Amino acid sequence: MTLIVSWSLNLLSNFVQAASEEPGKSSVGRKVTGFRLNDTAAGQRSFGELAGRSATVIVFLSTECPMSNNYLDPLAELAGKYEGQGVKLVLINPNRDEGQTQVAKHAQEFQIKFPMLIDLEQTVADLLGAKTTPEAFLIDADGVVRYRGRIDDQYISRLKRRESVTRHDLGVAIDELLAGKPITVAETEALGCPIARPVVPKHAKDSNAVTFNRDVMKILQDRCQNCHRPGQAAPFSLLNYRQAIKWALDIERVVTDRAMPPWKPIAGFGHFRDEQRLAESEIATITRWVASGMPEGDPNDLPPPREFSKDGWQLGQPDLVLTMTEEFEIYATGRDIIRQFVIPIGFDEDKWVTAVEFRAGNARVAHHAIFFTDSTGQARKLDAEDPLPGFSRIGFLPSGAIGGWAVGTQPQPLPDGTGMRLPKNSDLVVQMHYHPSGKPERDRSAIGVHFAKSPVQKQVAGLPVFGFRFQWPEGDDRIKTTGWFRVPVDVHAISVFPHMHMLGKEFKMTATLPDGTVIPLINIEDWDFNWQQAYFYKDPIPLPKGTIIDLESYADNSSRNPANPNNPPRLVTFGEQSTNEMCIGFIGCTADNNADFFDLLRLRRPRAQAGASIKREP
């Protein structure tokens, strides 16, 4: 099968039949013939030249959409599979502002070795009614559209993937067409990034109208630009008006759905520092701006550009920078990667840590990280046993933890006078979570460590609350796990870190004080393994001796859970791998009385019950 990557640089069209379709309107059953494209590698090409003798597949792609990039390898495999059966593949980039330079750079980065064109006038996109990248169209030998929609069911929503593909929709449609059978499913919804249609911004009708310069830009600066700027994790930038109007409809949708910015705790159940949750007024502002035609407004209303650290360290130059000892290679596509890397610290004395900051070596693939310490040498042994850099399983009991990082989060210094002990002669073990980007990548990330500059009065300890369920039965979509812990000494809680794996759905923790007062600690109703992090309270929460911390979680081990790592579902047991399951809530805290700290460490053994039928002690 000839793979013609038709990302149109300059499209000249001459359509003999078929008027343009409204974007999103079904074109299945319509006949498409007679257009010509400018192919920068081979000159002007007609549809007849591009079409396969048995069928033609047209797929719309984008350089900026990560979901689109993740399909480059699968599409190449599809091309190879049908090469000898008369099916050709045409890939078209319909986004106006992804010009020749950007497309050429993208082709080089992703090692695309085929002619590339761009549909600048969106003529082919309009012809087929395409609205999304990636979106596929299967056209038979007579020029009739027989299938349109997704390539497969890898994604269940924007950027949220299944653990494994369960239906290859485009491949099934091709097989049925070649076999002379009716197409079983002729149309599916394509999930991805919207094709950037031409926008003619309107002028503000009155002085009270919402404008980009006065109202919207500040929201983007405060809520979006941590990630949406060059060199960071987001696939596109939101630094100016031109970039914002390109993605405006998409921005409105994801903020209305609260998919972005990523913030999992529900409002009012715990009060946290640097909450990335948009206020209702901010969502309303964006919605009104889009509805009114996205006016730019008075240039004098534009706030000053947000300043970011030039050296990449948001807290300033660290006292110690710990860098992965080797580069790690991330494959182009496939499942996410969880990998541990050992970094020797090399101190012969204990150190007090007040803040840690993560700097991704490759922001395109680094998604989140957790920083453990190991004083036993066991992590080094596991590293030595694995031929690749790092190792793939935990396999050791960490001596402690000093923090973590997730996309979009800010480094969180500990409260004044507190610190985490970094044991002498220990190693840092960094657990990395990587997202494949669509092309082979390399990463060598670093962690900046800040030490206490004044005497530490309180040592921070992690208080684990375990939900001890050892089996998650297959087929059950609401598996309840409860756990509890009685606080042995007076403490102040400063943070909470929920942890479950792929089956997790909901996670809630509360603290019941000795006088019966119930304090909400955290509540997540749409758990996502890919977005776990530590949350720091705005103010430390006093938890007197005898306080009971309750944990309640729900998991889904059915086929209805798209994150289920097993297809079909099977019995899942407690364990360290993402294919196992866990349920733990870590409370970062300090003992009110320093003399009680070692009692806190000694008495923080888990007290938890598996299942709702076992009640905690009064």
For the regions a protein language model found, what residue spans apply to each?
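Aromatic- and Gly/Pro-enriched helix-to-coil junctions and flexible linker segments
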Residues: E187-F347, N425-Q431, P436-G438
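Structural microenvironment flanking redox-active thiols in thiol-disulfide oxidoreductases
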Residues: N69-F110, L117-L127
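Bacterial N-terminal signal peptides
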Residues: M1-N14
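N-proximal helix/coil linker or "cap" segments that precede and/or mark the start of modular domains
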Residues: L12-G34, G48-A51, T184-A186, A190-H203
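Beta-strand-centric surfaces of beta-sandwich/beta-rich domains
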Residues: P265-F272, L302-W352, E357-H492, P498-E617
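A short beta-strand-turn-helix
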Residues: F35-T56, K205-R214
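Thiol/selenol-based redox catalytic cores and closely related redox-interacting motifs
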Residues: D119-A196
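Short active-site neighborhood of thiol/selenol oxidoreductases, capturing the structured segment around
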Residues: G48-N69, I174
